[in-house]
Amino acid sequence: MKNNSVILRNKTTKNLCFYLKEIAVVILFSQILLAQPKISGLASEPGAFSRIGFGARGIGMGNAMSAVTTGNLVSYYNPALTVFQEGNSFQTSYSFLSLDRSLNFVNFTRKFDFYSKKDSLNENREPRSTAGVTLGIINAGVSNIDGRDNNGLKTGELTTSENQFFVGLANKFSKKFALGINAKVFYYRLYDKVHSSGFGLDIGALYVVNDQYTVSFVVSDINSKYKWDTSPIYGQDGTSTTDNFPVLMKAGVGYRNKELKLTASAEFERSNVKTNIVRFGIEYNIYENLFLRGGLDQFDLSNFDSPAKPALGFSYFETFDNIVIGIDYAFMVEQYSPQDRHIVGLNVNF
């Protein structure tokens, strides 16, 4: 009887150890699965190239630009900004990116002041209304893609080209309030005979609280989407699909202190793909025509696994007669890339 009881206890102990090991393995694997980082909701959505930013100045300030009303402005960040542009502003930027990627920007912004004939004799007359217009292009692409057929044989190098063309119009309804709209056309050439185009809208508003503070509200990518048709390549086996861009809603605050020569801004952006992003930016006129910048972009409150993107930059300006020419530079961290982003720009104000 003793031997039987000993054998029974040994079997029970072995079974218990076996089950405990199984439970430990299940717990271990569940912890590994739960520990996987969440993927950024915006990064995997269509039109990612159009959400990187615009130009060296904006990227250097963490893209927190929707409430900034000084310097060279672009309606990309807020269509209402163009009415605050001083002079005629032309900007262009080129980005140095890894993995054979390219990203380029071109923009022209101007405001128009309209006066009343009744004020023609008044030396210090003020405009009765102000309008603004922006024309811009964003171009992105990937080159040197190794093309191969079903047998693995090389067919040549492939390239992609993704573009956004936009026109922004704005009106200043009073000294404190401005409203604007962007009309955007997208064109994406993905492969031979496979391309797509789309149309979208941005609507933005800006309110001047006082000489130091401004607030903004913008809704971006309304109706923006790509429509694809692969039947030119696959014939009857081809399919038609529609990829909708995420709709972005953001609110911003801008601060300017003329005595300290300081400009600061902050934004909160929410999308319909459940991202809640915070941005910060600062610009300091450290010496005459030299400006230093810093910022933080893509700080997602709903996904701390998605890394934020710090940025730095500067601008230097020289005046030639009535023309101001400036050089811009921005650096932004890109965590999952062999190298970080470098953006070099040229701006002309006349």
Indicate residue ranges for each PLM-predicted region.
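A broad structural signal for short, well-ordered beta-strand segments within beta-sheet-rich domains
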Residues: 1-2, 130
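Acidic, Ala/Val/Gly-enriched low-complexity intrinsically disordered segments
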Residues: 6, 22-26
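A cross-taxon signal for low-complexity, glycine/charged-rich
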Residues: 12-22
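Hydrophobic transmembrane-helix microenvironments that flank and shape a buried ionizable site
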Residues: 18-19, 28, 75, 199
